[in-house]
Structures are given as C-alpha cells and as structure tokens.
Amino acid sequence: MDWLMGKSKAKPNGKKPAAEEKKVYLEPEHTKSRITDFEFKELVVLPREIDLNEWLASNTTTFFHHINLQYSTISEFCTGETCQTMAVCNTQYYWYDERGKKVKCTAPQYVDFVMSSVQKLVTDEDVFPTKYGREFPSSFESLVKKICKYLFHVLGHIYWAHFKETLALELHGHLNTLYVHFILFAREFNLLDPKETAVMDDLTEVLCSSPGNSGATGDGANSGASGAQNHVKER
C-alpha cells in the first residue's frame, strides 16, 4: 500500500479555461439518462447490524470493479496520443510512486497505476479481510478515502475526455448512474474532500439534485464551484 502514502498533485493543464469548453455531458438530454430510477440515497445508508468497515469494504470493492469496467468500454480511445496527460477539465493529475517520486504520465498509464494498485489492495487479506475473525487495519478508512479519490479521477476523466465515445456506445446512462451512486456513497461517509470533487461540481449538482437525491449536495457540494476549476490543487 506504499503508493497510497505518497503525495498527489494537480495543476492547470494548459488548456483554455473549462468555462470556454463545451461540456457535452451537461446537456439536459444526456444528464437525464439513467439505467434506473432507484433512489440511491437510501441504498448507500449503512444497514443495521452491519459493521461500518464491512460496508465500506464491500462497496469500495464493487465501485472499483464497476469503474474499471466502465473505463474498459472506452479504453481503446484513451491512448498516449489522445490523452497525453491525466486531465479533468483544466486540472492535470500526476502520479507519485512508492518512493514519493513525481511521475508525469499519460491518462492510460495513470489509470493503469490506479487500477493495478487498487486491485492489489482489495485482494490483500491484511487490508480487505474476507475471512471470519480477521480485523481491518486501523488505517482502513484513510485507505478507502485514498482509493475513492483515485477512482474519482478516473470517472472525471471519462466524462471530460471520453463522454462522446461513451455517448456513441449508448453507455452514458450507465456512466451517470454509476457516478450518482459513487458520489452519494462517498458523501454519506465523507470519503471525498469537497475540494477534490469541485472540478466536477457542475455535473454533481445536476445529477445528484434530482428527487430522491436531494441530500447529496450537502457537505460542500457547491463550495468552491465558482472558479474552483481555475485554481491549482495540491493534495
């Protein structure tokens, strides 16, 4: 889990400001597309008699697999040529290896780092125990927060760089549904820093403010939305 101990930074990627670029994923005809009308706000609540860490582990693993699958549908379009940086809006993400060394990489390389690292974690019995009697590590919640942060980067990149391909494949309903479920779960348990998600606040507000999801925009969903995408982020 050394990769989680390193830093992660983001900075403007040199593109024109996001406000000047048309965000196709925000068009009403696309934001209303879902594969279910289920109220995810109810689904994410911790069930009675279920241990919190068990609930976090189960859902985090599920989100990892679903986001990995969603990315795989457009992976052939996400190449070192088309996506030379891991960008979301005007924000560029860098990877830091286990030695804390800054690694500038293409989007597909970044996603591969994320997915391979998370795969190792969720299959590690010392971190994500599945056998009766095994305890979760004391740092488990912080590890889940780190995982969610990187999975959010992947979702954001799909929207920002590959929504048109997702639209052509008619998988935007799946993407929207996954995004809503993921964000509501993360907000329910404070797994994502509002400053981290500010880059996608416009989409979050539209998708998560529908009936049944009205509680999702709390916890600073709109804090920093005004001009937040033009600021350098370091984390």
UniProtKB/Swiss-Prot annotation:
Q: For this protein, what post-translational modification is recorded in UniProt?
A: Phosphorylated.
Which keywords does this Swiss-Prot/TrEMBL entry list? Answer: Cytoplasm, Metal-binding, Nucleus, Phosphoprotein, Zinc
Q: Where is this region: Disordered?
A: 1-22, 213-235
The places in or outside the cell where this protein is found are: Nucleus; Cytoplasm, Perinuclear region
Principal place where this protein is found? nucleus
Listed GO MF terms: metal ion binding
Q: Enumerate the residues binding Zn(2+).
A: 78, 83, 157, 162
Q: Name one GO cellular component term.
A: nucleus
Name a biological process GO annotation.
Answer: positive regulation of neuron projection development
Task performed by this protein: Stimulates the autophosphorylation and kinase activity of STK38 and STK38L.
PANTHER family in the cross-refs: MPS ONE BINDER KINASE ACTIVATOR-LIKE MOB (PTHR22599)
State the family it belongs to.
Belongs to the MOB1/phocein family.
Listed under subunit, the entry gives: Binds STK38 and STK38L.
Protein name (Swiss-Prot/TrEMBL): MOB kinase activator 2
Species of origin: Mus musculus (Mouse)
